[in-house]
Amino acid sequence: MENIEKLLMQEKILMLELDLVRAKISLARANGSSQQGDLPLHRETPVKEEAVHSALATFTPSQVKAIPEQTAPGKESTNPLMASILPKDMNPVQTGMRLTVPGDFLRPHQGIPIPRKSELSSTVAPLRAESGIQHPHINYYVVYNGPHAGIYDDWGCTKAATNGVPGVAHKKFATITEARAAADAYTTSQQTDRLNFIPKGEAQLKPKSFAKALTSPPKQKAHWLTLGTKKPSSDPAPKEISFDPEITMDDFLYLYDLVRKFDGEGDDTMFTTDNEKISLFNFRKNANPQMVREAYAAGLIKTIYPSNNLQEIKYLPKKVKDAVKRFRTNCIKNTEKDIFLKIRSTIPVWTIQGLLHKPRQVIEIGVSKKLVPTESKAMESKIQIEDLTELAVKTGEQFIQSLLRLNDKKKIFVNMVEHDTLIYSKNIKETVSEDQRAIETFQQRVISGNLLGFHCPAICHFIVKIVEKEGGTYQCHHCDKGKAIVKDASADSGPKDGPPPTRSIVEKEDVPTTSSKQVD
């Protein structure tokens, strides 16, 4: 814009000079003195040609003086400079926004004032902060350890370097000097190599070529295999959190063999509890939620130590997960404390037609102290299909024994009770009558010879021994009549308001720890 205005101003000046030259030519022609040549150019105020003619018409003989004697021919004419049309005798003409005076032509830039640039409109970089423009502040992030340790200037690269990697420490700094000092202090104390600065465009968190991928160290958990469907991107709806598709016998045998042969190498998110016949999973923080769900469906979990966000149990049944959330929110003062889920479960039972019995669980929730995991040992796995029934009876006996131990505990709070699951926690107060009735109802529903989905004489015999130790009596009409038969799946899922007609009856006498009750 400034260049255009300057050119327009120069155009006006040239037009004024052109008008002045034309006026002088007209004046010379009127006086007949064209032979005297061009007159010297003076910086005079421009006038119109009509004004020149009108000025000449006002001349009188008295106003004209005699010309002195000339030494050269052709100089007898009147000197045009003595006429009355000199600039001082002319009326100024307004030709622009301002009147132009002769002195302006002697000034720099023809007298045109050059406006000073304002500071706000300046494009000089140091003045940007004064005009309100804020420069972006770059933070620096130090990833102290892990496979991608270094100093980053981008949070996206830092998150990719630390996300999903357990035990990685990182911190944000305002300047590169502070970040470098913190990184050097850490590497010096740990006696490790100096951390490199990794700009945003040079961060290589994944191999760029197939050759680099082959030379990269394999992931520690690459050998694990999950049996379920593809992991959903978000928590499934309550109706989707179930064991459908139902766990098959092949799935159970795979998990059973996996936990028996696990020796603790390659995965620090779990350890095992090994017995002579069976090994059970113990899941720690950052365990695979899909693996936890499948082991829960197989009845092969002893303990779960979840993170504060409970991500490890997010695929368990919704009511179980909600009960754990309520315990963390309502039952403990410090919600940041670690908790545990101690599970006693039966295992599935199959027939030729398919799944006959789904596991039943008794789960205790509590605050976890310092965890000292046991050493996992690789155990021999020689289980056959015909051995599954014997294993199911063994886990069923342990389940009944754990359930009956609740009668000896005087301070219990029932967190959730369902048809096949009971969740409880320790309480500082005595067990209320409502919780006591819930425990007794659950015992009556599950403690019977049909615990595993079919009538099992071995289970009945075990119940007789347990009840007789407590001074009670037990009767099973199927055992008395010699009708130990295998029931179908419908016998295990009878109506909730009453036991199925094939249930046996357990009668107990009054004892100091329990009231007289009927268990079917």
UniProtKB/Swiss-Prot annotation:
Cysteines engaged in disulfide bonds, as pairs: none
Cellular component terms (Gene Ontology): host cell cytoplasm
Biological process according to GO: regulation of translation
Keywords, alphabetical: Host cytoplasm, Translation regulation
Keyword field contains NAD: no
Cellular localisation: Host cytoplasm
Region annotation Disordered: where it falls in the sequence: 487-520
InterPro entries: Ribosomal_bL9/RNase_H1_N, RNase_H1_N, RNase_H1_N_sf
Top-level division of the source organism's lineage: Viruses
Entry annotated with the keyword NADP: no
Function: Enhances the ribosomal termination-reinitiation event leading to the translation of major open reading frames on the polycistronic viral RNAs.
Similarity comment: Belongs to the caulimoviridae viroplasmin family.
Note: The inclusion bodies are the site of viral DNA synthesis, virion assembly and accumulation in the infected cell.
Protein name: Transactivator/viroplasmin protein
Organism: Cauliflower mosaic virus (strain W260)
Organism phylogeny: Viruses, Riboviria, Pararnavirae, Artverviricota, Revtraviricetes
